[in-house]
């Protein structure tokens, strides 16, 4: 055991609020930058109350849900055509019920995959596309060549397909599962996007028009499953061929899972207000946003340890980020970083009180999470956390030096550092620690594997697209858009479009990584995909994470706070 590990395992926990009086903090009189973030719109007394007054699920609803689960299992076992089985799987997944029927879904998809030699889907656009998407999502490779039958001799898609809106929509969604170099899927994406944009206002079926509009705003593959489930439950209710059993179970299950999440939110809110970090005026106070992100990554109730530790580490991480970005001087940040590298509190008395508070909160919470993992999972994860924190803070330190030195790095240099500074290697490693098979498996995340590299790079670039206007106004650190503008002389509009193109290309690489990263168990692959989906949710239309009173508020409230009305039973 090295010295840093020994320190982590034996160091006493320190109450940072015993050592720092935020009201008389000597830092307050100094000329410090401010993040200018608005106060949180979420009432912490209310959030804490969710621990004991959450959405309680009635006993009769639990019994009804069990009955309906049995009926759905019977549906999976009943004889049906392959397309009907695919559509059942699709609806179950989109309703957010896949965590209840993991075995049935896998058996159904493997059966369809094995029976593919007879080509039952051939010439049927919807069937071909749905089969392609669901099997690739499941980790079963289907070649892009299955779509050649819909192209002419020059490789163009037949314009007659534009009349088949349902098939077009399925092909559109399937195209986002493509890999780099799969030109047929690139053509499919461009073709279906153009056709659907020109057709959706004239679609007679309201439910189909609603689905098309929703998909064009953001494809299914890029959406957060838990948020999508809430939207789809309401949309599915309006469909003519809606299955009442699936709909009723989806509503009940959504509320039951939400009840679990609400209890966790309440307990986490109680912890957060004891840290003192919520009182720092320059930093973001975003506990509920952090929980929303953990819920995006791992909403399944069985991932409680992953969710809670991601929120705890993530909430502290946000304040550490703001400390580097807007608060600390270079000398202070160098001392902070060296203390993280030593994983020691010995020299932090040389730091100003506020940075001391942040360091001790980070140190304590990380050691506390490590001890919890030791208790619940049976292995020592603290060395893994220390490595991740060191890389995290060194990336922040580099950005601070760029900022204070007035240096604009090339896009590639910025991106390699930025994929770490975005924080997702640390957060995803936190999630991985909660589900790893054993201590030896923790070595798989150092050095950073491609799966983590590309998911984190995507989150960095998506974040940059959404936050660059606000951060430019604050005079904050550079973003990829500015680096590209400086490197090439491009306008901001051209640079923004370039970064969007880079995002699309890196999604293709990440899609392939999901097949190539066989050293990881499936939940961790999904964690990575979901982390990028969370980035799309928070940053697709601006800074929905830093600005709490934004468009994200409605979805967060519907997913985390408001249960679905069940109506008459």
UniProtKB/Swiss-Prot annotation:
It catalyses: (2E,6E)-farnesyl diphosphate = (1S,5S,6R)-alpha-bergamotene + diphosphate; (2E,6E)-farnesyl diphosphate = (+)-alpha-santalene + diphosphate; (2E,6E)-farnesyl diphosphate = (-)-beta-santalene + diphosphate. Keywords: Lyase, Magnesium, Manganese, Metal-binding. Its cofactor is Mg(2+); Mn(2+). Signal peptide: none annotated. It comes from the Eukaryota. Its EC number is 4.2.3.82, 4.2.3.83, 4.2.3.81. The keyword GTP-binding does not apply. GO terms for molecular function: magnesium ion binding; terpene synthase activity. The keyword Glycoprotein does not apply. (2E)-geranyl diphosphate binds at residues 284, 321, 325, 460. A motif (DDXXD motif) lies at residues 321-325. Coiled coil: none annotated. Transmembrane segments: none annotated. InterPro entries: Isoprenoid_synthase_dom_sf (IPR008949), Terpene_cyclase-like_1_C (IPR034741), Terpene_cyclase_plant_C1 (IPR044814), Terpene_synth_N (IPR001906), Terpene_synth_N_sf (IPR036965), Terpene_synthase-like (IPR050148), Terpene_synthase_metal-bd (IPR005630), Terpenoid_cyclase/PrenylTrfase (IPR008930). Binds 3 Mg(2+) or Mn(2+) ions per subunit. Disulfide bonds: none annotated. Mg(2+) 3 binds at residues 463, 467, 471. One of its GO terms (biological process) is diterpenoid biosynthetic process. It is an enzyme of class 4 (lyase). Pfam families: Terpene_synth, Terpene_synth_C. Belongs to the terpene synthase family. Tpsb subfamily. Catalyzes a mixture of sesquiterpenoids from (2E,6E)-farnesyl diphosphate in fragrance biosynthesis. Catalyzes the formation of alpha-santalene, beta-santalene, epi-beta-santalene and exo-alpha-bergamotene, as well as traces of alpha-farnesene and beta-farnesene. Also acts with (Z,Z)-farnesyl diphosphate isomer, producing alpha-endo-bergamotene, alpha-santalene, (Z)-beta-farnesene, epi-beta-santalene, and beta-santalene. PANTHER family: (-)-ALPHA-TERPINEOL SYNTHASE-LIKE, OS04G0344100 PROTEIN-RELATED. The Asp-Asp-Xaa-Xaa-Asp/Glu (DDXXD/E) motif is important for the catalytic activity, presumably through binding to Mg(2+). This is Santalene synthase.
